Design a protein with these regions (language model features):
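Ligand-binding loop in jelly-roll beta-barrel domains
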Residues: 70-92
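Short, conserved beta-strand element in jelly-roll/cupin
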Residues: 34-44
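A short glycine-rich, Lys/Arg-flanked "PGG" loop and its adjoining helix->strand segment in the class I
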Residues: 204-216
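A short beta-strand submotif of the Rossmann-like class I SAM-dependent methyltransferase core
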Residues: 191-194
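Short acidic-glycine-tyrosine-enriched beta hairpin
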Residues: 51-71
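Class I (Rossmann-like) S-adenosyl-L-methionine-dependent methyltransferase catalytic domain
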Residues: 23, 74, 92-118, 124, ...
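Conserved short histidine dyad/triad with adjacent acidic residue
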Residues: 12-31
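A short acidic, Gly/Pro-enriched loop at the edge of an enzyme's catalytic core
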Residues: 181-189
């Protein structure tokens, strides 16, 4: 557990100020470990199953400190002594630190999956949003150019960059529909769940720009919604790939990964279920001439 980082610390609690929610059955989020610190007094603590049945009870003191509470483990504070003083911290792995601290969406799973193939250099995050992928790539040693059309998203990312003293992310407001050109050269260019929000005539010129701006042996990663017979594209998406269309654009590249699997959008239907869509996912490496 030595590699966990505290991203949030609550004020010191007394017997009068421990929130009721922590005395009821609850659990931590995925990827979040909780750590109670006892400064004085005693605290009775129970680990529970999902049904609320007690699995084990423990008495914690300044001499007998609680262990880390694992992500999504059910638990509650049973009781405390009148003189209790304790503090709760939330911790995570280094790669989740900035996302948790600043309440960003997690780094895209395909970025994480591509990491073993990447070896630093310069990266371009096309449609970076608030920076969930750019921040991760900066932690991996990349010099990152982060582009987005939304000034509010870029402002949030710039605030994080300033607060954390990050030197290797450079934000730029770009409207790719009016100008898809890429003038620099990069070892990794990613565009995850962005292209379906672009005007259809923009996408193929943008991909051509991504390809020419990629160094030999560099990688492109694209994830984009598809329009298929079994699951038509969402009506408000200006663009979607047809079957095999994205892969065909990378003829002559080393296709490391390609699939058209069903995934979920963040939006939900009338029943509250996340909407499913086929996604074209491609990780490709540029080969020498």
């Amino acid at each position: 557990m030595q590699n966990l980082i505290c991203y949030k610390e609550l004020p010191v609690w007394t017997a009068q100020t421990i929130p009721q929610g922590f005395k009821n059955q609850h659990n931590t989020k995925a990827g979040t470990w909780a750590k109670l610190k006892i400064y004085q007094g005693e605290l009775s603590f129970a680990f529970l199953d999902e049904a609320g049945q007690v699995q084990s009870e423990h008495l914690f003191t300044p001499e007998q400190q609680p262990p880390f509470i694992e992500p999504q483990a059910w638990h509650k504070i049973v009781s405390t002594s009148d003189d209790i003083e304790c503090l709760l911290q939330f911790c995570c792995t280094p790669q989740d630190y900035l996302n948790k601290k600043y309440q960003l969406s997690p780094t895209h799973s395909e970025i994480l999956a591509a990491t073993p193939y990447l070896h630093g250099g310069r990266a371009l995050d096309v449609g970076c949003g608030q920076g969930r992928n750019s921040l991760y790539l900066s932690q991996q040693g990349f010099e990152v150019d982060a582009w987005d059309v939304n000034p509010q998203s870029l402002q949030k990312l710039q605030q994080i960059i300033n607060a954390e003293g990050i030197q290797n992310i450079h934000v730029q407001q770009r409207d790719l529909n009016t100008d898809p050109s890429i003038t620099g050269t990069y070892d990794f260019i990613c565009c995850t769940v962005v292209m379906m929000f672009l005007e259809a005539p923009t996408v193929k010129p943008l991909i051509a720009q991504m390809q020419q701006a990629t160094n030999v042996n560099g990688f492109n990663l694209i994830v984009c919604a598809m329009d298929t017979d079994d699951i038509p594209v969402q009506p408000d998406f200006p663009f979607a790939f047809k079957a095999g269309e994205l892969k065909a654009l990378y003829e002559g590249w080393n296709i490391v990964k390609y699939n058209e699997n069903v995934g979920e959008l963040h939006r939900v239907d009338e029943q509250g279920n996340r909407i499913k869509q086929h996604f074209a996912t491609l990780l490709a490496q540029k080969l020498g001439v």
